Amino acid sequence: MANTIQNNRSSVDFGFHLPPPADGANKEVLSVSQILLERKRSSIMERKDKIVKAENIITDWRKEVIEKVGETNLKKFHEYSKNQRRSNFGIKELSHDPDGLAKLTLAKRKARENSIDLLKNAKLEPGGLKNIHRRYAKKLDDLFSPKEPKTSRLEMLPESKVPKGVLEGKSNPWTTRRPPFDGWAWSYSWSRWGGHDPDLVSYLNAATGSVGHRSEYQNYDAGDFDGLWLEYDTSVGVWYWPPHAGPVDIWIKARCVKGRYSVWLDDEWGWSDSSTWMRGNITVNVSPSIVDEDRAESWWSHTWGNPDSTTYGSDVIAPNSVLWFHLVTSDPIPAGAWSYIKVGTYDRHTSVLNDVSTDAIMRDWWYIEEIWMDVH
């Protein structure tokens, strides 16, 4: 059990490319660029505020554990945990032993049994501590959840709901865009308490319509109050000149390459617990019509507990699945001006750990194949 609140690291980065839709369209480019920059500035300030609140939640979490366990018992647990790790769970050397892995597994299992005895001797039950851990893990996940869009209008719909003209590829009255797209944007921000910095891969490619990301968080020496909060945005965009003013009707054809989670968990002590959430979203923004970004959850996973070196994983969306997303803007776009339509992904990867080692991988990868637009 280590005090890892002091081992907090954060990173923020972003970029975008916005070529003009036509010669002399400087006003539109500057306007959309300003919107993108202001949205990022606002999200950074919001993240800064949430990190302070997260630190307060972790402090309260620690206080409640101390009140439940008592200072003397907590010191015993600390010493036991430290001695077990230093001695490699009582096994000095494994590198030249062909049975080393099996011996280590047995030694760790024995250490867990002894840790439960420590709790019982202190008149404590593992379930009591786990209830505390899960309550505070939920508080952190709620804190890290983004604000809901002011008007949530983006929907994931079956092909049967798609207009016949779109499915048949008719260009009247629709304007259709396929890769390569005009612009692109990406951003990520993460904070961790313990473990390694997350390994990140972007799938963004405006030439092919590829969006999404891969993130991996490894923490093989999880302390009392470890965790990760990661957000990753990618998008491609197109300029649109409407035939007249009015709300924009948008249909998006997207092909899912990977909507997959993989979470390895390894219990360390009888009081251990963990929760890992992964959420993938498709997003749409129409500048300047929509102030914030609309999104529809495409998949999610929640993995929890303290198993004995177990990996949980699944393709939540079958690879190569084609899904349709639909949005009609609540506000009209003006006539005689360019609007910028941005389509992509917003992913959130959160882990909260208490003495559970983990290797958690999120993959959310899509191809935006078609964007259909018409003005009502």
Model-derived segments and spans:
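Mature extracytoplasmic or otherwise solvent-exposed domains
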Residues: A2-H376
